[in-house]
Amino acid sequence: MQQIDFYMVDAFTSTTFGGNPAAVCPLDQWLPDQLMQKMAKQHNQSETAFFVANDDGFELRWFTTQSEINLCGHATLAAAHVIFEHLKYPHNTINFTTRFVGPLSVSREGEWLTLDFPVWLSEPVQQPPALLTECLGITGYREVRAARDYLVVLENQQQVEAIRPDTFAMLSLDKMVCVTAPGDGEYDFVSRFFCPGEGVAEDPVTGSAHSMLIPYWADRLGKTQLLAYQKSERGGELRCQLNGDRVLIGGQAKTYLVGKVWLD
């Protein structure tokens, strides 16, 4: 019987029960894709990160309960936390290779981990689908853009907080949905992220969406260093920086659970 270490980590938070939880499984070698998919479904977290050490660092993959995905920020942060804290990685930067988005890295400075991700530039959507505003329950917006996800820009933080989406109706959209606005106080911008098609009605903290949010707000606010907050029930703070064609996304993480997966 094969035993695999299992960790559950709350990412983008300094306290347990905050941020976004992810499952993490270090592997000696890759398991069959079908088996990793079954494991991710059994873990019942929004994402499970699997990684295997290689000569340059680690190969990293992410699975939702339904499928493998191309990028996941909070599960990358969670995997890096496990490598630094539990596997006692001796260096301050972890280099990951991925199947879909090329090389990624995570650096450590004190309690903060910083993701180095590619920029995702969004384009204006001149005629957004009516279903988009209907399922968000809004009648107006500052603008709508699209990249991997729809980006719906509202006027203020209160409007973002007031969203009560129809996530069942949202299943008919062809993209996931990010809602954002300028922050009221200490935060430059706030956001929420809805992805019912991935099995998650509202994602607590979405690192990958900030690959799109950071270049947008850097341009609008005229600054390259930003402080962001995702206004979900659990919530999460992100230190953000635009660095050319890359974004730096900083957060903290806390281990919630350590255990073993037993495979026949």
Predicted regions and their residues:
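Active-site proximal loop and beta-alpha junction motif in alpha/beta enzyme cores
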Residues: 1-71, 77-264
